[in-house]
């Protein structure tokens, strides 16, 4: 309902602050242009509770990325204040923020996902790793401090960099096409195929504007149905709600591997969720409207 007061939460203090500011501005501009009573609130600092109590919004569009928006704290706060919001619940956000926990749940349910474990000083010192592997922070997004590692020397450097962001995981490297699917509750959108600027879809590839996106992805009808079903099952298994995105690798044998679930996807010009929706004929404004009107 357009007479509801909406707060767009963006910014914050995570390493993904700049991306979040861009997402928040795009969403806020869209809502205002559609006639919504919307204001933006930078979640940086310690005044968020006071701001929300002052504004008394009916709904919050969560455009925070990284720990600020995806570790469950904001969801818990909004639920405590009885404010409907566009992201997953506190419990689900905690799970999806931690890639290892998410992976363990998916593997328990026999969902296809690459093998992984925590990377430790002891493991780095061992010489029994089969390269290449992926090394990344267990928590975090935008592929910050994510590396394709091909040797023990590279492993040491990757571990040192990734450990700046918390616990580190080492994951089986899967070669193939990078595919993603956006979901808003029961609406599963078209898959998008990403041709990254670099060897894989790292931070630079995501935000340089030089990667190539195919939306729709060009999968055959059977494979498109399969990847959408896998995306929705993963979304449900991890208890997601609202707007989320599921990322895959599609290998040359026709297998999909779930890489991660993002509970607060980007909404910038280069972001994947709007491209997924656009492939279904849903433009950016309509997509924003669908997300906010389904806030829970």
UniProtKB/Swiss-Prot annotation:
It catalyses: 2 D-alanine + ATP = D-alanyl-D-alanine + ADP + phosphate + H(+). The keyword Metal-binding applies. InterPro entries: ATP-grasp, ATP_grasp_subdomain_1, D-Ala_lig_Van_CS, D_ala_D_ala, Dala_Dala_lig_C, PreATP-grasp_dom_sf. Its main location: cytoplasm. One of its GO terms (biological process) is peptidoglycan biosynthetic process. Keywords: ATP-binding, Cell shape, Cell wall biogenesis/degradation, Cytoplasm, Ligase, Magnesium, Manganese, Metal-binding, Nucleotide-binding, Peptidoglycan synthesis. ATP binds at residues 129-180. Pathway: Cell wall biogenesis; peptidoglycan biosynthesis. SUPFAM superfamilies: Glutathione synthetase ATP-binding domain-like, PreATP-grasp domain. Mg(2+) 1 binds at residues 247, 260. Transmembrane segments: none annotated. It holds the Pfam family Dala_Dala_lig_C. Binds 2 magnesium or manganese ions per subunit. This is D-alanine--D-alanine ligase. It comes from Francisella tularensis subsp. tularensis (strain SCHU S4 / Schu 4). The lineage of its organism: Bacteria, Pseudomonadati, Pseudomonadota, Gammaproteobacteria, Thiotrichales.
């Amino acid at each position: 309902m357009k007479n509801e007061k909406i707060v767009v939460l963006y910014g914050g203090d995570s390493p993904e602050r700049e991306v979040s500011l861009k997402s928040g501005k795009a969403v806020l501009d869209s809502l205002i242009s559609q006639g919504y009573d919307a204001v933006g609130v930078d979640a940086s600092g310690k005044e968020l509770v006071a701001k929300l109590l002052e504004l008394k919004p009916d709904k919050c569009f969560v455009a925070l990325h990284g720990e600020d928006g995806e570790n469950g704290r904001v969801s818990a706060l909004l639920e405590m204040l009885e404010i409907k919001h566009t992201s997953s619940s506190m419990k689900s956000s905690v799970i999806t923020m931690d890639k290892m926990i998410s992976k363990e749940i998916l593997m328990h349910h026999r969902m296809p996902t690459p093998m992984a474990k925590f990377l430790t000083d002891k493991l780095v010192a061992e010489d029994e790793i089969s390269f290449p592997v992926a090394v990344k922070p267990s928590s975090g997004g935008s592929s910050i401090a994510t590396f394709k590692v091909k040797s023990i020397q590279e492993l040491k450097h990757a571990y040192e960099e990734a450990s700046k962001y918390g616990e580190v995981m080492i994951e089986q490297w899967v070669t193939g096409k990078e595919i993603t699917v956006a979901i808003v509750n029961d609406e599963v959108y078209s898959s998008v195929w990403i041709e990254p600027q670099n060897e894989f879809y790292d931070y630079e590839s995501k935000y340089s504007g030089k990667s190539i996106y195919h939306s729709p992805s060009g999968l055959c009808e059977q494979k498109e149905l399969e990847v959408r079903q896998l995306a929705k099952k993963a979304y449900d298994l991890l208890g997601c709600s609202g707007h989320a995105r599921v990322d895959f690798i599609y290998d040359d044998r026709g297998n999909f591997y779930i890489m991660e679930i993002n509970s607060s996807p980007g909404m910038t010009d280069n972001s994947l969720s709007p491209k997924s929706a656009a492939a279904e004929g849903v433009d950016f404004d309509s997509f924003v409207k669908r997300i906010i009107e389904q806030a829970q």
